[in-house]
Amino acid sequence: MVSERSLLDLNIPRRQTLRQLRRLKIKSTFYTLSKRFKEEESYNKVRLMYQDEAGFVRISKMSSCWAPKGSRPSIHSHYMREYRYCYGAINAHTVDSFFLIAGGCNTEWTNAFLRQVSQAYPDDYILLVMDNAIWHKSSTLEIPNNIELTFIPPYTPEMNPIEQVWKEIRKRGFKNKAFQTLEAVIDKLQEVILGLEKNVLKSTVSRQWTRLLFENN
């Protein structure tokens, strides 16, 4: 059972209450789908994945750094606000992940991402947890047959473990750096994503509360 006390022990903010966790209905949905597909033999398994997008810009991400005593570090910067975006989805338990570098955050790119995730796991049914961005609820969103969307409560990014993956990517590839071109941003993003070790991802996204959701009430 997920108790109010256990939520405090897990360092979850007080505003993230047990009611908000239960509103996700992840546990009941996951087990209902798993049972149904096992009986129907229509999908191999149900994958629970957390989805989000992040923007990466040519401007330097200023952060603290080491420097010789008595000297002030100099960091290159500029004012070119050109972005590339990255869509991502990750399983918080197995750390299986999927990423798509995109030209924007909108319905068109979300449709492209959903199609590619669907094609990456054609024999599985994917329960995709995401935030309430307007393009996630567009009337023209095309949801593949093997994907189902569920949404975290508004203003609760801490309930989406993939948020920590973006922090790790920025720390590895975008801290105190300026990029001459958008192509350089894309290259660095690809390099960092491909270099993310499974053990690092596991420690980054693993949350005890995500496991508690599946314990018996």
Which residues does each predicted region cover?
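Short functional hotspots at interaction and active-site rims
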Residues: M1-N217
